[in-house]
């Protein structure tokens, strides 16, 4: 009998409390970068019933109306009714932002390499902190993402579309999805075993109506029919009621959905969150670079699955380590792939920032529905422009091996 395994990932909607916080943090970052691309930003947000607290460290020459940015973001998400317990125009906004520590700034503004006399423009910026970051790609989906997280994101995005268009009028902003995929003995996805959708709703709608709409207008509209069968389970609002939601039901905090933001648990995670951080913070920029590398490796046919680890020391430009793991799927040795990666990609913070053009206000759009594998927006770390350079570098290194 062939061995089959299950793997589960989840996603949450833009109206989930933690995602509200992420979007506010990134909206503040974007507003600052639009006026001052050289700004250093670390903006954290906490939301709960009737209140938003914004705190952190910012070094900038720009003035931004934090209060207005917060309220506009909340309204765009859909919290505009007082009965939700959290409304854009009535919520209390409490900013508490200070300047970045000069001890940190001296290492970011002038890397160790520059202080030691290594004259190179890309040695100017040091990593904003120590840490390890992962990027991943796999050939399970056209966007080279694991299927469980891809489907989970699509479900909550579909919910948001139906809510904002008014097609399903009883929907409220908070929602979660979870998809369990069954894999065969070759680790290939064969079917969807279980789908969970929990969606906030108006009080008068029946559970039967919600279930019918979720199955017909959300699940079957998103998940390809060949993955669904008579044994697939649909668990819709399993508690039986989800009227109280958003920050009225749970507090939210920036950086608490790091697995949703990346690969749904299918790949490793270095632990650093993304939202509210400018690109000198390698938690964010190096994670994007690692995804860029992994995706181009898989797209080039050099592996069917690739995980890239990068690691940095605070105030140092060059990564302290670069590792490529292809889980036995590569067409050449991993040492050759690592050497090719070092040739093709400049992985110093300034190199990553230039390569991916990260001083632009592009971050708020990433703060819900995943930072990786997005097909609805154009993100530079999802581009496949390094396929040819990687292929050529691997060929040259293989000849010399």
UniProtKB/Swiss-Prot annotation:
- On the tree of life, the source organism's domain of life is Bacteria
Q: Does the keyword Nucleotide-binding apply?
A: yes
Indicate which residues the UniProt annotation says bind L-methionine: 57, 100, 250, 281
Q: Give the protein name, as stated in the record.
A: S-adenosylmethionine synthase
Fill in the subunit field for this protein: Homotetramer; dimer of dimers.
Q: Which Pfam families match?
A: S-AdoMet_synt_C, S-AdoMet_synt_M, S-AdoMet_synt_N
Where, subcellularly, is it found? Cytoplasm
Biological processes annotated in GO: one-carbon metabolic process; S-adenosylmethionine biosynthetic process
Pathway(s) of this molecule: Amino-acid biosynthesis; S-adenosyl-L-methionine biosynthesis; S-adenosyl-L-methionine from L-methionine: step 1/1
- How and how many cofactors are bound, per the record note? Binds 2 divalent ions per subunit. Binds 1 potassium ion per subunit.
- Which InterPro entries does this chain map to? ADOMET_SYNTHASE_CS, S-AdoMet_synt_C, S-AdoMet_synt_central, S-AdoMet_synt_N, S-AdoMet_synthetase, S-AdoMet_synthetase_sfam
Give the cofactors, semicolon-separated.
Answer: Mg(2+); K(+)
Question: Which EC number(s) does the record attach to this protein?
Answer: 2.5.1.6
This protein's encoding gene: metK
Q: Which reaction does it catalyse?
A: L-methionine + ATP + H2O = S-adenosyl-L-methionine + phosphate + diphosphate
Name a GO molecular-function annotation. Answer: magnesium ion binding
The record's region (Flexible loop) falls at: 100-110
List the HAMAP family: S_AdoMet_synth1 (MF_00086)
Ranked from the top, the taxonomy reads: Bacteria, Bacillati, Bacillota, Bacilli, Lactobacillales
């Amino acid at each position: 009998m062939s061995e089959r395994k299950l793997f589960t990932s989840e996603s949450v909607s833009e109206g989930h409390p933690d995602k509200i916080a992420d979007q506010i943090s990134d909206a503040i970052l974007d507003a600052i970068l639009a006026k001052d691309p050289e700004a250093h930003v670390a903006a954290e947000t906490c939301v709960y019933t009737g209140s938003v607290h914004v705190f952190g460290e910012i070094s900038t020459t720009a003035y931004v109306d934090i209060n207005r940015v917060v309220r506009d973001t909340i309204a765009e998400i859909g919290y505009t009714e007082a009965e939700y317990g959290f409304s854009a125009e009535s919520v209390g906004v409490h900013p508490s932002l200070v300047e970045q520590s000069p001890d940190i700034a001296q290492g970011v503004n002038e890397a160790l390499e520059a202080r030691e006399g290594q004259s190179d423009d890309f040695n100017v910026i040091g990593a904003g902190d120590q840490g390890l970051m992962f990027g991943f790609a796999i050939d399970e989906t056209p966007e080279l993402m694991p299927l469980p997280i891809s489907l989970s994101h699509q479900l909550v995005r579909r919910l948001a579309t139906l809510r904002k268009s008014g097609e399903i009028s009883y929907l409220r902003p908070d929602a979660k999805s979870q998809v369990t995929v069954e894999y065969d003995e070759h680790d290939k996805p064969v079917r969807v075993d279980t789908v969970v959708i929990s969606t906030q709703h108006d009080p008068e709608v029946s559970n039967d109506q919600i279930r019918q709409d979720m199955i017909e207008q959300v699940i079957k509209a998103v998940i390809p029919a060949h993955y669904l069968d008579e044994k697939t389970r649909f668990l819709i609002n399993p508690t039986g009621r989800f009227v109280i939601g958003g920050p009225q039901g749970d507090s939210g905090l920036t950086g608490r959905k790091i697995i949703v933001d990346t690969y749904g648990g299918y790949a490793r995670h270095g632990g650093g969150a993304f939202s509210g951080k400018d690109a000198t913070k390698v938690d964010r920029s190096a994670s994007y670079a690692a995804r860029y590398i992994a995706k181009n490796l898989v797209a080039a046919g050099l592996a069917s699955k690739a995980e890239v680890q990068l690691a940095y020391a605070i105030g140092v430009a060059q990564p302290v380590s670069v590792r490529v793991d292809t889980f036995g799927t590569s067409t050449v040795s991993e040492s050759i792939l690592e050497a090719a990666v070092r040739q093709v990609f400049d992985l110093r913070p300034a190199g990553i920032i230039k390569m991916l053009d990260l001083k632009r206000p592009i971050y708020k759009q990433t703060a819900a529905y995943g930072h990786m594998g997005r097909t609805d927006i154009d993100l530079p770390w999802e581009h496949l422009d390094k396929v040819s350079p990687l292929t050529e570098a691997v060929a040259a290194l293989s000849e010399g091996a």
